[in-house]
């Protein structure tokens, strides 16, 4: 399969990888949800620990074993790596908690609110300008979230909904930290550092509330970890081969996959109001992404003209 992909043009490669990312993200979440109500720390250690092994192999293969900075960072990138790890730990903890109580597609679409938090955090921490249209689209996105969680419903669960939104905020912080890192760290270093450090930090919490796992639960968690390896490297590969503006729209396909898997595996399907909310969030997110790329292109053209 890799040989066939290599024969394609870069844009097509990027599109294929972003679709693989969306599919395996949905599969990972399905497996984690199927594992049942076990402590979040335990789920995270399994998933991230397995991915850390893959990251270690990738770093060692690319740079050899002697250069420790390729594994644990250096003065130039340790701050960005640490911020990314903190946001990642908080984000995955919140997202896994939400995943246990919300239907799969709802948890996925609320995670996609992260694109709005990227703009907010970039304005606060990176001093990037925020324009009126961006503010409007952010408000529309959060309105869509309100429609999805439907606080007037009898079945409204405030804690999982807030956890999903908080997880999206942390995912946004994760993305901003990656922008702060820029080219200061290789993708394999970022993957290894986050997954290894987060697994180490969460291990004591796992041991304090350790739950003996059944065989099928263990298998689900191991498979989730293996699928998450594909998620991490597919995303990196997608943006390596194609500009973000050409493939970012397709990153929201995970919601479609999640809805399908949720129906097939759990027999759940979102209500009409929730689907309307999904459409509002995804439409606002796509417009925001396209608008951001338009701003970058205009800024770049102005610099070249000057």
Task: Give a label for each model feature.
Residues 23-27, 31, 82-97, 147, ...:
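Hydrophobic alpha-helical transmembrane segments of multi-pass membrane transport proteins
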Residues 1-42, 154-180, 300-306:
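Glycine-/small-residue-enriched transmembrane alpha-helix faces in small-molecule transporters
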Residues 49-53, 142, 199-200, 256, ...:
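Small-residue-rich packing faces within the transmembrane alpha-helices of Major Facilitator Superfamily
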Residues 1-23, 52-83, 132, 156, ...:
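Membrane-interface interhelical linkers
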Residues 95-97, 114-136, 256-275:
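C-terminal transmembrane-helix exit sites in multi-pass transporters
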Residues 107-113, 181-197, 232-263:
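Helix-helix packing/entry segments at the starts of transmembrane helices
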Residues 10-14, 37, 45, 73-77, ...:
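Juxtamembrane helix-entry segments on the extracytoplasmic side of multipass membrane proteins
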Residues 133-150, 273-292:
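Hydrophobic transmembrane alpha-helices of multi-pass small-molecule transport proteins
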């Amino acid at each position: 399969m890799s040989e066939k992909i290599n024969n394609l043009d870069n844009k097509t490669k990027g599109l294929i990888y972003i679709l693989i990312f969306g599919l395996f993200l949905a599969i990972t979440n399905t497996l984690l949800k199927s594992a049942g109500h076990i402590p979040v720390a335990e789920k995270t250690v399994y998933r991230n620990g397995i991915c850390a092994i893959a990251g270690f192999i990738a770093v060692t293969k690319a740079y050899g074993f002697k250069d420790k900075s390729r594994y644990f960072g250096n003065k130039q990138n340790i701050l960005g790596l640490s911020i990314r790890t903190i946001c990642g730990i908080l984000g995955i903890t919140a997202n896994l908690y939400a995943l246990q109580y919300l239907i799969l597609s709802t948890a996925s679409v609320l995670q996609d609110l992260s694109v709005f938090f990227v703009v907010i955090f970039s304005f606060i921490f990176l001093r990037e300008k925020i324009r009126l249209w961006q503010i409007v689209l952010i408000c529309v996105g959060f309105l869509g979230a309100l429609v999805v969680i439907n606080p007037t419903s009898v079945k409204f669960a405030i804690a999982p909904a807030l956890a999903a939104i908080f997880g999206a905020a942390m995912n946004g912080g994760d993305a901003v930290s990656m922008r702060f890192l820029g080219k200061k760290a290789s993708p394999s270093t970022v993957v290894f550092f986050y997954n290894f450090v987060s697994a180490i930090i969460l291990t004591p919490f796992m041991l304090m509330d350790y739950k003996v796992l059944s065989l099928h639960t263990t298998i689900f968690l191991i498979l989730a970890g293996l699928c998450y390896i594909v998620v991490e490297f597919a995303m990196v590969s997608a943006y390596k081969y194609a500009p973000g503006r050409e493939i970012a729209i397709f990153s929201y396909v995970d919601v479609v996959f999640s809805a399908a898997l949720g129906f097939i595996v759990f027999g759940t399907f979102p209500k009409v109001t929730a689907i309307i909310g999904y459409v509002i969030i995804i439409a606002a997110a796509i417009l925001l992404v396209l608008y951001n790329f338009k701003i970058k292109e205009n800024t770049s053209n102005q610099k070249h003209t000057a």
